[in-house]
């Protein structure tokens, strides 16, 4: 029997993460590429959702003794937890009235089908929830465990897609 946690960081066309077994303290890396035509937040959301669908398809739920905590980008975690993706499935439209991208809609339909079958085995949380700061009054070992994999996932992504400078160059070419 096992207790699993999944940490998924997404940037551009790539999701990198770790699938961890809390009891055995073992983890395996996870990498998923997905090409999207969408830009910005919508593109990131589609790439992350593609990774989640791919992961859920291959997940063996028979050996679990607790639901799998999946930490992913907040744009996906929020839509799942608020169940707002169901509005998209029914109407085919976003809140602003524009059509949902066809590829993303296909992924949401597949996700919904997987959740209908195995939804009780998965809990979705924002990856930022794994990054506790300070010393909150929670289980410190669990906080360190989550923080380790949060940091690991983002550092793996940033090796491929480096972050911008720590302090942005604010020189806008203004000559006085």
Predicted regions and their residues:
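RNase H-like nuclease fold core
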Residues: 1-47, 57-59, 161, 171-176
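Acidic, metal-ion-coordinating active-site neighborhood of RNase H-like domains
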Residues: 9-11, 133-137, 141, 149
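Short, low-complexity, polar/charged sequence segments that are solvent-exposed and flexible
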Residues: 24-26, 88-91, 143-145
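Glycine-rich loops and low-complexity Gly/Arg-rich segments
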Residues: 30, 93-98, 151-152
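Conserved phosphate-coordination/catalytic loops
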Residues: 41-46, 50, 101-105
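Hydrophobic alpha-helical segments
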Residues: 44-48, 52, 138, 150
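RNase H catalytic domain
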Residues: 53-139
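Charged phosphate-binding loop/patch that engages nucleotide di/tri-phosphates or the phosphate backbone
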Residues: 127, 139-176
């Amino acid at each position: 029997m096992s207790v699993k946690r999944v940490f998924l960081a997404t940037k551009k066309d790539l999701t990198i993460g770790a699938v961890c077994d809390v009891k055995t303290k073992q983890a395996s890396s996870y990498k998923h590429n997905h090409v999207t035509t969408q830009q910005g937040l919508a593109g990131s959301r589609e790439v992350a959702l593609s990774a989640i669908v791919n992961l859920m398809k291959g997940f063996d739920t028979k050996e679990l003794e607790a639901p799998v905590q999946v930490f992913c980008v907040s744009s996906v975690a929020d839509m799942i937890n608020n169940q707002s993706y169901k509005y998209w499935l029914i109407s085919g439209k976003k809140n602003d009235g524009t059509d949902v991208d066809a590829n993303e809609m296909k992924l949401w339909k597949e996700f919904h089908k997987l959740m209908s079958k195995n939804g009780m085995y998965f809990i979705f949380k924002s990856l930022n929830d794994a990054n506790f700061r300070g010393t909150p009054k929670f289980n410190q070992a669990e906080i360190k465990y989550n923080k380790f994999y949060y940091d690991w996932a983002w550092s793996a992504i940033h090796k491929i897609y480096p972050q911008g400078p720590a302090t942005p160059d604010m020189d806008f070419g203004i000559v006085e």
